[in-house]
C-alpha cells in the first residue's frame, strides 16, 4: 500500500457515540460537528434542529432513531461518526453500527449514572470487542456526581475505568476539567460557545485530589500494560508520552476505558474528548485484519488485511431510502479499493452488483467520491439486491464476512389500508421499510387476511406507521398491539408414526415417516433436524422434504397457532412407494407427524418477559411495587440513586400495555421507567387458557 494511503488509514477513526436515551448523545455529536467546523450553527435537540436527527419523527420526538453517519476532521484525522439511538426499541441500529465501528464513545449522564440501556449497549459493544472511552456528560446539572458514575461503571458494566480528567467545580459552578495526564486545568470561555479554552495551573484547592487520582491512573494503566508496569516497578514516574502510549495500547486492547467529563450542552469538555478519540481509539490499521469464510465453506477461514492492495471486501450495514437518490446502502470497506462503476459480488446472496455513485455522507448533505478504500464508511447508490448484513467483495476473490445478530420481534399490530390505492402503496412502503430495518417482520394472517407488522416495541411500530404515512402516503387503520407469543414442548415423545396415503385416479401419494420430538433447550429460536434413517428406507432425495414439512408445521403451533420453538426432530424410519412417493407426499407426512408429536409432547405457551426499571420518589415506592405485582411482575432488586428509588422487575409484556399512563397517574408524573426484552417464559395455566380460548375464537 502506498505510504500516503497507509498514513490516511492510520489517521482514520470510525467511531460510534452510544448511550442511554437522554444522556446527551446527539447534543454531544452536534458539538463535535460544530468544533470540527462541519456546522456553522449549533443545532439543539430540544428545538428540533439537530443535524444528525434528520428524520421528521426524530426532530419531533427529540430522539435519534436511525444511525446517521457523518464525516468530520480533527487534528488532521478523519473521524467517521455514527450517532446511534439510545431507545431500547431501536437496538438493531446500535447492533448494526457496532459491527462496523473500530471504537466508541460511551456517553453517561452524570446525574443518572449508568442506566439500563447503557448496560445493553455496553454488552453489545463487549460482544463485538469494541474499544471504548467514556464521557460523563451533564456535569452542570443539579445532582451531577462524577465519582458515583465511575463507580457504577465498575459495578454495573464490569469496566476498568481509567480516569484521565476530574471535573473542576460541579453543577452550576462547573467551569472546566483537570487534565490528569498533563496535570493542568482547562477553563472554558462562554462568549465563543466554548470554541476556546485556556490551559492554567491546577488550583491549590484541587491539587491534592489531582495528585491522588493521577497516581490511581498510572496504577490502573500499569496493571494493564507491560511496558508501563516495568517503569512502575522501577519507581520511575512516566513521561506524558509514555503514559499516553500506554493508555492507547491498553484502550485498543479493550483492557481499560479512559474516562473524561464535561457538559456538551454548556460547550465544555468536547474538544479534549475529540483529542481522546484521536489519541486512544484505534484506527483501521490497529484493528488489522478482518476474518470471514469461503463461500459455501464455513469452516475455511479467509483473512483480509486493512490494505488497499488486498482484494476488495465490505459489509453493508444499513439500507436507507433517500428522496433524491433512491436506495442508499451504507458500507464499511474492510480491504481493497473500489471506484464508481465497479462490478462487485454480493457473496452472501451470490449476486453480481454494480456500484453506482459513491457518497460521503454528512448528516443531511452528501459529497460525491470517485473511489473509496479500506477503512472508510460511505453510502453507495445502485445496489439492487443487497440487504443489511450482506458482504460485497471482489468477484475474483469471494469471501463472506461475519454478519449481525438481530433479535426477534416481541410485539405486533394488524394494519389495514383505508382504500384500494393505499393497498398498492402499502406493499411498496413495507418492502422498503423492512429492507431498512431487519427487526421489522411482516406476515399475512391466514385467517383474517390482514397484514401484520411486528417490531421491538410500541414506539418502534409507531414510527413505522408514521413513516408509511409521511413518506409513502399510506393511510391505514392500525389495530391494538398484540404480544408475540410462542409455543414449545416440555417432554420427549418417541416413534410417532404417520402415513400419508391418497389414492385417486392415476398415480397416488404415499409416504410414511417415524419421528422423535424433544425439547432442544434453546432460547426462542431453536430447531434441529437429525436424520437417522438407514438402509434406504426413505430415499435420500426425500429427507429434505420431511425437514421442510416439520419446519412448516412449526409456524403454527398446536395450542393457539403461535410459532413453535426450541425443538429437535429425529427422523428414525419410514417407508416409500416406488411410484406414488414424491417430495410433496413426504413434506405432508413430515408436517402431520410433527403436529401429532407436538400434541403428545406436553405443549405450553411462552410469553415475552420484559426487564423493567422504574425510577420513583420514595413516597410512591409502595404504589409502584404494588402495581408491578398486580401485573404478574417479579421484583428482582431495589436500589437507591440520587435521592430516588429504583425498582427492577421482570414483567410479562402483555401486562405492560398502557403502563406509561398508569405510572404517571400513580406517581403524579414523578416516576419514569425503561423496559427491554429479557427472555421468553412459560405462561401460567389460567392465563394460557384465556390465550387459547381467544385464539380459537371461543
Curated annotation (Swiss-Prot):
Keyword Protein biosynthesis tagged: yes
Chain residues that bind GTP: 19-26, 83-87, 137-140
GO biological process, one term: ribosome disassembly
Localization in the cell: Cytoplasm
MF term (GO), any: GTPase activity
Primary site of residence: cytoplasm
Keywords: Cytoplasm, Elongation factor, GTP-binding, Nucleotide-binding, Protein biosynthesis
Gene Ontology, cellular component aspect: cytoplasm
InterPro entries: EF-G-like_DII, EFG_II, EFG_III, EFG_III/V, EFG_IV, EFG_V, EFG_V-like, G_TR_CS
Domain tr-type G span(s) in chain numbering: 10-285
Family listed: Belongs to the TRAFAC class translation factor GTPase superfamily. Classic translation factor GTPase family. EF-G/EF-2 subfamily.
Protein's job: Catalyzes the GTP-dependent ribosomal translocation step during translation elongation. During this step, the ribosome changes from the pre-translocational (PRE) to the post-translocational (POST) state as the newly formed A-site-bound peptidyl-tRNA and P-site-bound deacylated tRNA move to the P and E sites, respectively. Catalyzes the coordinated movement of the two tRNA molecules, the mRNA and conformational changes in the ribosome.
NCBIfam families reported in the protein's UniProt record: EF-G, PRK12740.1-3, PRK12740.1-5, small_GTP
Protein name as catalogued: Elongation factor G
Amino acid at each position: 500500500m502506498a505510504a500516503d494511503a497507509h498514513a490516511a488509514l492510520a489517521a482514520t477513526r470510525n467511531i460510534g457515540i452510544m448511550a442511554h436515551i437522554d444522556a446527551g448523545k446527539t447534543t454531544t455529536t452536534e458539538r463535535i460537528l460544530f468544533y470540527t467546523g462541519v456546522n456553522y450553527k449549533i443545532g439543539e435537540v430540544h428545538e428540533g434542529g439537530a443535524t444528525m436527527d434528520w428524520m421528521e419523527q426524530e426532530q419531533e420526538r427529540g430522539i435519534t432513531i436511525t444511525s446517521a453517519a457523518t464525516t468530520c476532521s480533527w487534528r488532521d484525522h478523519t473521524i467517521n461518526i455514527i450517532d446511534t439511538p439510545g431507545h431500547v426499541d431501536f437496538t438493531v441500529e446500535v447492533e448494526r453500527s457496532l459491527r462496523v465501528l473500530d471504537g466508541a464513545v460511551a456517553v453517561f449522564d452524570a446525574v443518572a449514572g449508568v442506566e439500563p440501556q447503557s448496560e445493553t449497549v455496553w454488552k453489545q459493544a463487549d460482544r463485538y470487542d469494541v474499544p471504548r472511552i467514556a464521557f460523563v456528560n451533564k456535569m452542570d446539572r443539579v445532582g451531577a456526581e462524577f465519582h458515583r458514575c465511575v463507580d457504577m461503571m465498575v459495578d454495573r458494566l464490569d469496566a476498568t475505568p481509567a480516569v484521565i480528567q476530574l471535573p473542576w467545580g460541579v453543577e452550576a459552578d462547573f467551569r472546566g476539567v483537570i487534565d490528569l495526564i498533563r496535570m493542568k486545568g482547562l477553563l472554558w470561555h462562554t462568549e465563543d460557545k466554548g470554541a476556546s479554552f485556556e490551559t492554567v495551573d491546577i488550583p491549590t484547592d484541587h491539587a491534592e485530589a489531582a495528585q491522588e487520582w493521577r497516581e490511581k491512573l498510572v496504577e490502573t494503566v500499569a496493571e494493564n500494560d507491560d511496558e508501563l508496569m516495568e517503569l512502575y516497578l522501577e519507581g520511575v514516574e512516566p513521561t506524558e508520552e509514555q503514559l499516553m502510549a500506554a493508555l492507547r495500547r491498553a484502550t485498543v486492547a479493550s483492557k481499560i476505558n479512559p474516562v473524561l467529563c464535561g457538559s456538551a450542552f454548556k460547550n465544555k469538555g468536547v474538544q479534549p474528548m475529540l483529542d481522546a478519540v484521536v489519541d486512544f481509539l484505534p484506527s483501521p490499521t490497529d484493528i488489522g485484519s478482518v476474518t470471514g469464510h469461503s463461500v459455501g465453506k464455513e469452516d475455511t477461514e479467509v483473512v483480509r488485511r486493512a490494505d488497499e492492495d488486498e482484494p476488495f471486501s465490505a459489509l453493508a450495514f444499513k439500507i436507507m431510502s433517500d428522496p433524491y437518490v433512491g436506495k442508499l446502502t451504507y458500507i464499511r470497506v474492510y480491504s481493497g479499493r473500489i471506484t464508481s462503476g465497479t462490478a462487485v459480488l454480493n457473496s452472501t446472496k451470490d449476486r453480481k452488483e454494480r456500484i453506482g455513485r459513491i457518497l460521503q455522507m454528512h448528516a443531511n448533505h452528501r459529497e460525491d467520491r470517485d473511489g473509496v478504500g479500506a477503512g472508510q464508511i460511505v453510502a453507495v447508490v445502485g445496489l439492487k439486491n443487497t440487504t443489511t448484513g450482506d458482504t460485497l467483495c471482489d468477484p475474483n476473490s469471494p469471501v463472506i464476512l461475519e454478519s449481525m445478530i438481530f433479535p426477534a420481534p416481541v410485539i405486533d399490530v394488524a394494519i389495514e389500508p383505508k382504500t384500494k390505492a393505499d393497498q398498492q402503496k402499502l406493499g411498496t412502503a413495507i418492502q422498503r421499510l423492512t429492507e431498512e430495518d431487519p427487526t421489522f417482520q411482516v406476515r399475512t394472517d391466514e385467517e383474517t387476511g390482514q397484514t401484520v407488522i411486528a417490531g421491538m416495541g410500541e414506539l418502534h411500530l409507531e414510527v413505522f406507521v408514521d413513516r408509511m404515512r409521511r413518506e409513502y402516503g399510506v393511510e391505514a387503520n392500525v389495530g391494538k398491539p398484540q404480544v408475540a407469543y410462542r409455543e414449545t414442548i416440555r417432554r420427549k415423545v418417541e416413534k410417532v408414526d404417520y402415513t400419508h396415503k391418497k389414492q385417486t385416479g392415476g398415480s397416488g401419494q404415499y409416504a410414511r415417516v417415524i419421528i422423535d420430538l424433544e425439547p432442544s433447550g434453546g432460547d426462542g429460536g431453536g430447531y434441529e433436524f437429525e436424520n437417522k434413517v438407514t438402509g434406504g428406507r426413505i430415499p435420500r432425495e426425500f429427507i429434505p422434504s420431511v425437514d421442510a414439512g416439520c419446519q412448516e408445521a412449526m409456524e403454527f403451533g398446536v395450542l393457539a397457532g403461535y410459532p413453535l420453538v426450541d425443538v429437535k426432530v429425529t427422523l428414525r424410519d419410514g417407508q416409500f412407494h416406488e411410484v406414488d412417493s414424491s417430495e410433496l407426499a413426504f413434506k405432508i407426512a413430515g408436517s402431520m407427524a410433527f403436529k401429532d408429536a407436538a400434541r403428545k409432547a406436553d405443549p405450553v405457551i411462552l410469553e415475552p418477559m420484559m426487564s423493567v426499571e422504574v425510577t420513583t420518589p420514595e413516597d410512591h415506592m409502595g404504589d409502584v411495587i404494588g402495581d408491578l405485582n398486580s401485573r404478574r411482575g417479579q421484583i428482582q432488586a431495589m436500589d437507591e440513586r440520587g435521592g430516588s428509588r429504583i425498582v427492577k422487575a421482570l414483567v410479562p409484556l402483555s401486562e405492560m400495555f398502557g403502563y406509561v399512563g398508569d405510572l404517571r397517574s400513580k406517581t403524579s408524573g414523578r416516576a419514569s421507567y425503561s423496559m427491554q426484552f429479557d427472555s421468553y417464559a412459560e405462561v401460567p395455566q389460567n392465563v394460557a387458557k384465556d390465550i387459547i380460548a381467544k385464539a380459537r375464537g371461543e
